UniProtKB/Swiss-Prot annotation:
The gene is folD. Catalyzes the oxidation of 5,10-methylenetetrahydrofolate to 5,10-methenyltetrahydrofolate and then the hydrolysis of 5,10-methenyltetrahydrofolate to 10-formyltetrahydrofolate. Belongs to the tetrahydrofolate dehydrogenase/cyclohydrolase family. Transmembrane segments: none annotated. One of its GO terms (biological process) is tetrahydrofolate interconversion. It comes from the Bacteria. It holds the Pfam family THF_DHG_CYH. This is Bifunctional protein FolD. It comes from Erythrobacter litoralis (strain HTCC2594). NCBIfam families: PRK10792.1 (NF008058), PRK14186.1 (NF010783), PRK14188.1 (NF010785). InterPro entries: Aminoacid_DH-like_N_sf, NAD(P)-bd_dom_sf, THF_DH/CycHdrlase, THF_DH/CycHdrlase_cat_dom, THF_DH/CycHdrlase_CS, THF_DH/CycHdrlase_NAD-bd_dom. It catalyses: (6R)-5,10-methylene-5,6,7,8-tetrahydrofolate + NADP(+) = (6R)-5,10-methenyltetrahydrofolate + NADPH; (6R)-5,10-methenyltetrahydrofolate + H2O = (6R)-10-formyltetrahydrofolate + H(+). Pathway: One-carbon metabolism; tetrahydrofolate interconversion. NADP(+) binds at residues 166-168, 191, 232.
Length: 298
């Protein structure tokens, strides 16, 4: 068996195209474009790349991009004041504070200061609570992107066995909740799970989100499983090379001989995250203006 490659890059491109078309319609109805504000504190090179990419994608989707770059020694008081200002700005529909923050800033208190209605990252405890009880809110971008890929590949997930490896608030826990809401039978596995290979072996759907390079081996997988690899890890460089390869949490090459479908790294889940961020911003804009947006439109 050779697995079908789930092309997240192509799916994300189609999603961004739909979001852009709907953003144009929103502008015609509201007299303004949807707006996304991204706040970067410090000069972390990886974060700077992420923010730059988000800005480009926002503009390409017919949205306004507001970028705020603050020095690494920014005080909590100053950062909270900026968040408060953005909460009250009618041109801003979504607010994203790029993580990680410098050590002297408490991430949870900063996220808690963002209006839940503008929390397009879905990290606010109110949005986490809304997800857990089935109320309308914002879902973290990466797990929602994973669900879109699964729905596109499998359709109805009812009754399927799903194992989520990882229990973070950003991916693992919301991913499990989304699968449960889709009527899958869900197990959350983690570092203390006993007999992890046996647990994974019974799953029709495996979502790996632990940040350990190629941890999930092919012998762990059920024949015909669908594998979503959220991990992104850089291996040590090979002799003569400056940088090592990027790999996921799954041994992709050998797992592809067992799974029915699998996401690659890179090019699988990663591109979906920014596309879903734009989708969430579009949804926030419609809600903020009281304009209907059909749920199946995006």
């Amino acid at each position: 068996m050779t697995a079908e490659i789930i092309d997240g890059k192509a799916f994300a491109a189609r999603l961004r195209e739909r979001v852009g078309a709907l953003a144009e319609k929103f502008e015609a109805a509201a007299g303004r474009k949807p707006g996304l504000a991204v706040v970067l504190v410090g000069e972390d090179p990886a974060s700077e790349v992420y923010v730059r990419n988000k800005g480009k994608a926002t503009l390409a989707a017919n949205m306004e991009s507001f970028e705020y770059k603050l020095p690494a020694d920014t005080t909590a008081q100053d950062l909270l004041a900026l968040v408060k200002k953005l909460n009250g700005d009618p041109a801003v529909d979504g607010i994203l504070v790029q993580l990680p923050l410098p050590d002297h800033l408490d991430e949870q208190s900063i996220i808690a200061a963002i209006s839940p209605d503008k929390d397009v990252d879905g990290f606010h405890v109110i949005n986490a609570g809304r997800l857990s009880v089935g109320q309308r809110g914002f879902v973290p971008c990466t797990p929602l992107g994973c669900m879109m890929l699964l729905a596109d590949r499998l359709g109805d997930l009812s009754g399927l066995e799903a194992v989520v490896i990882g229990r973070s608030n950003i991916v693992g826990k919301p991913m499990a909740q989304l699968l449960l809401d889709a009527n899958a039978t869900v197990t959350i596995a983690h570092s203390r799970t006993r007999n992890l290979p046996e647990v994974v072996k019974r799953a029709d759907i495996v979502v790996a989100a632990v940040g350990r390079a190629e941890m999930v081996k092919p012998e762990w997988l059920k024949d015909g499983a669908t594998v979503i690899d959220v991990g992104i890890n850089r291996l040590p460089p090979e002799p003569g090379k400056e940088r090592g390869r990027l790999v996921g949490d799954v041994d992709f090459g050998r797992a592809s001989e067992v799974a029915a479908a699998i996401t690659p790294v890179p090019g699988g889940v990663g591109p979906m995250t920014i596309a879903v961020l734009l989708r969430n911003t579009l949804v926030a804009a419609h809600r903020n203006e009281g304009i209907d947006l059909p749920e199946d439109a995006i």
